[in-house]
């Protein structure tokens, strides 16, 4: 959901101003939603929906000032063990939407890292799109420029489609994977593709998801149809434990050689990704622990957002 500029005739305010006023009354003045609805002449349902919209767009940010917020012990250990610049570990919660909660945590981290008019490079995947959905208001207000790290326009639309129309987004106009290495080479040398790849490498901050070979059918790269189950089995037999942007690496963090898809991908290679100053990985699930650890060992990410159980599994591995 995004905050639009529709004017509410009773108050003469745009929707974003309504959200800001409701948030102030609710969080600072301690008014109930019923009291706010009476004061503004809105239904209680409308007040509730605008509060939710404010959270999802990033206009409303909740900050918990406690040393326990973010599972400090895990964050400290991960920073020390993997030389990370930034870590956010969200507390575990049974039966919760882990992907959505990781998106909130990653959005908060990015809002603290990005400066006005900086460039954010984004990778494909559920975790990164969950994050983007919660950044709409922030991206618009801070004039953050967005650029994709890979081809595959459809893979980005669940996040980009939620952004304000005024947001600056530069998308690689090509598929994630070409049908052959020759076609991939040709596409990457087209100016319209090359220019976006150069812009992505010049980004101030990047955010990427991390896939695990152990996920099998649940892996985004399989569900999206970029590799087959048979290919994944062969990749696993070559020692791969995880991937970022479709590039597979082993438990030490080294890119696995002699994998067909690597020559057919249209996107920023991991060696170029490492030149971006801040590289945030967002991933959760104990089955991803080995892949996340390998991504940190390889230096592909230097910041991490994960959940408590996954953090514990990483530190045990």
From Swiss-Prot:
Protein origin, superkingdom: Bacteria
GO molecular function: carbohydrate binding; DNA binding
Alphabetized UniProt keyword annotations: Cytoplasm, DNA-binding, Repressor, Transcription, Transcription regulation
Cellular component per GO, a single term: cytoplasm
Cellular compartments annotated: Cytoplasm
DNA-binding region, residue range(s): 33-56
Signal peptide: none
Documented activity regulation: Inactivated by phosphorylated autoinducer-2 (phospho-AI-2). Phospho-AI-2 acts by binding to LsrR, which is then unable to bind to the promoter regions, allowing the transcription of the target genes.
Family: Belongs to the SorC transcriptional regulatory family.
Function noted in UniProt: Transcriptional regulator that represses the expression of the lsr operon in the absence of the quorum-sensing signaling molecule autoinducer 2 (AI-2). It also represses the expression of the lsrRK operon. Acts by binding directly to the lsrA and lsrR promoter regions. In the presence of phosphorylated autoinducer-2 (phospho-AI-2), LsrR is inactivated, leading to the transcription of the genes.
Protein name according to UniProt: Transcriptional regulator LsrR
Organism: Escherichia coli (strain SMS-3-5 / SECEC)
């Amino acid at each position: 959901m995004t905050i639009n500029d529709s004017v509410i005739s009773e108050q003469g305010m745009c929707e974003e101003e309504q959200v800001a006023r409701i948030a102030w009354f609710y969080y600072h003045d301690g008014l109930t939603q019923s009291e706010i609805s009476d004061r503004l002449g809105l239904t209680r349902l409308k007040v509730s929906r605008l509060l939710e919209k404010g959270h999802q767009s990033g206009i409303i940010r909740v900050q918990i000032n406690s040393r326990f917020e973010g599972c400090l012990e895990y964050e400290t250990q991960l920073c020390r063990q993997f030389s990370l610049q930034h870590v956010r570990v969200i507390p575990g919660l049974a039966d919760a939407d882990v992907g959505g909660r990781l998106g909130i945590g990653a959005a908060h981290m990015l809002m603290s890292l990005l400066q006005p008019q900086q460039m954010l490079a984004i990778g494909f995947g559920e975790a990164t799109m969950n994050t983007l959905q919660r950044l709409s208001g922030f991206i618009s207000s801070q004039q953050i420029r967005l650029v994709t790290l890979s081809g595959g326009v459809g893979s980005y639309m669940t996040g980009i489609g939620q952004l304000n129309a005024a947001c600056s987004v530069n998308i690689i106009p090509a598929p994630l994977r070409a049908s052959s290495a020759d076609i991939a080479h040709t596409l990457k040398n087209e100016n319209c593709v090359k220019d976006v790849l150069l812009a992505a490498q010049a980004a101030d901050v990047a955010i990427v998801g991390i896939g695990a070979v152990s996920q099998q059918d649940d892996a985004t790269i399989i569900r999206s149809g970029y590799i087959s189950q048979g290919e994944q089995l062969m990749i696993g037999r070559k020692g791969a434990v995880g991937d970022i942007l479709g590039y597979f690496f082993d438990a030490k963090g080294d890119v696995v050689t002699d994998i067909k898809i690597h020559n057919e991908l249209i996107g920023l290679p991991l060696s170029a990704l490492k030149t971006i100053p801040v590289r945030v990985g967002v991933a959760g699930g104990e089955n991803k622990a080995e892949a996340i650890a390998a991504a940190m060992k390889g230096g592909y990410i230097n910041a991490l957002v994960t959940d408590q159980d996954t953090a514990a599994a990483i530190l045990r591995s």
